[in-house]
Amino acid sequence: MNTVATVFTRTLPLLIAVTAWAQQSPLVYPGGHGPGRGKHVVLISGDQEYRSEESIPALAQILAVRHGFHCTVLFAVNRQTGKIDPNTIDNIPGLEALRHADLVVLFARWLELPDEQMKEIVDYTESGRPIVALRTSTHPFNYRKHPESPYAKYSYDHKQFSGGYGRQVLGETWIAHYGAHQKQSTRGVIPAGMENHPILRGVRDLWGESDVYEITALSGDSRPLVMGQVLMGMDPASPPDPAKKLMPVAWTKTYTGSSGKPARIFTSTMGHVMDFRNRGFRRMIVNACYWAVGLEKKISATRSVEFVAPYNPHPIGVRGVAP
């Protein structure tokens, strides 16, 4: 990993070409002009279903080009082929980038990384630096083959370290689908008292194809920012399901690790690849990145969150599609 793929482009074909030859290297979008200039964001794509290998680079482009953040994108890479492979759960090259990161955007699901890679994530987590976590990141790790690993306690269903990384660090672990998967979508409802939170500045008409995840009780000092209303169909005009109550789909909390420094955490259980087509969702995630690094006073309700390159993602499913 001596090579770094540097991409600063408005065209998807160039992104595809660079990714094709640089899949063992981080994908880097240098920060442009904007309030985020000087902040380094490392974005990790490591889920098997929701096409984060397509949505996360698109988010990184927005953060870099529209807002000035320097962005490094890391992917799950097949050890045999050297290609991006979301179904690979034991290899995310380039995690050394976390040593110099100001923020991590995490999109992971049931990874079982080797100890030397997991150490980079845990060291970052314990350092007091912030995390923005999406969708399946409530259950990012699952140590089944190597329960002897010192990092096995971060498994989503760990009993002693209750709920593993998801519950302890981010606020909740995997419980169940609450809305019917791929049949019921989510309308975001902002609860009373949260309307003026900086993360929600300019956020309107929040909707996504994600089904609502079940939440038992958010841990620590978690504060729900958005509640998810289960809709009867996969259209924003679908009526609410009268049998379903509201569940948190976005919240903030702090996590204090071994450094003794409290870290800002933002978690959303939305994050379906099609959710990113919703401007309100994109703005919420971009705003969360500002808030996480202490730039909440710089959040604008009108600064562009439009895609830099055409965004025509593949449908979700447990298979790999290299960006």
Roles of regions detected by a PLM:
Residues 106, 110-202:
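A glycine-rich, often tryptophan-bearing local segment used as a flexible ligand/cofactor-contacting loop or short
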Residues 45, 225-227, 266-270:
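Active-site-proximal beta-strand elements of phosphoester/diester hydrolases
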Residues 23-36, 54-55, 62-66, 232-323:
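Extracellular ligand-binding/catalytic regions of CAZymes and related secreted enzymes
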Residues 1-7:
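N-terminal secretory signal peptides that target proteins for export/translocation
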Residues 9-20:
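Bacterial N-terminal signal peptides
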Residues 26, 64, 70, 89, ...:
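Catalytic beta-strand/loop cores that center a nucleophilic Ser/Cys/Thr
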Residues 39:
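Nucleotide donor/acceptor-binding cores
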Residues 27-32, 42-44, 48-141:
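Helical hinge/lid and interdomain linker segments adjacent to catalytic or ligand-binding clefts
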